[in-house]
Amino acid sequence: MPIFFYLFTTLIIISSLCVVLSKNSVYSVLWLIFTFINAAGLMILLGAEFLAMLLIVIYVGAVAVLFLFVIMMLDINFNQAITKLRENLSLSIFITLIMFVDLVITVILSTKNINHSSNISFAIANNISNTKAIGSVLYTDFMLPFQMAGLILFVAMISCITLTLKKRERVKYQDIRKQLSHNKGNVILMTKPILNKGVENIKYE
């Protein structure tokens, strides 16, 4: 078991670095999928098969594949992206250092609050699956954060739909109800044009 733990952990670290360092976005997404698969292996080692299946189905099967399709369909100029990155290299390094220092400080402050002298053991009932245990905790102790997360995702979904349904002034739209209500009385126009004037003064709907 420790061998598999170190194996999955090493593969996660290597694949995560490849996600960031890969110049091709398609390769980055493939490395991201590989990272999620190894994380699912860690979940299986911890006995959380439900979380492992969620990682595979949701992140690999939906999110990562969606990223892959979007990147493959977009016409991305990698040389131009690299040029822009080099122009803002100093700013990128500065922001990276700030985030790294923030992460180190957070880890140091978090480890100080851990009481290493206490030896607490948690009894896990054999008749309760990890799915039932996660559900009972999620809908009792963490019910409010869970509902807020769902509300945030719902607002994000509505915002995406609103942005895609934004009407443009120069785009012509079909009025289906008006088209279906046409008959020969309001479609066929009988007129007698004036000599040498053609149909200039005829008004169409």
From Swiss-Prot:
It comes from the Bacteria. The chain crosses the membrane at residues 1-21, 26-46, 54-74, 89-109, 142-162. Pfam families: Oxidored_q3 (PF00499). One of its GO terms (cellular component) is plasma membrane. InterPro entries: NADH_UbQ/plastoQ_OxRdtase_su6 (IPR001457), Nuo/plastoQ_OxRdtase_6_NuoJ (IPR042106). NDH-1 shuttles electrons from NADH, via FMN and iron-sulfur (Fe-S) centers, to quinones in the respiratory chain. Couples the redox reaction to proton translocation (for every two electrons transferred, four hydrogen ions are translocated across the cytoplasmic membrane), and thus conserves the redox energy in a proton gradient. NCBIfam families: PRK06638.1-4 (NF005164). Belongs to the complex I subunit 6 family. This is NADH-quinone oxidoreductase subunit J. It comes from Rickettsia typhi (strain ATCC VR-144 / Wilmington). The gene is nuoJ.
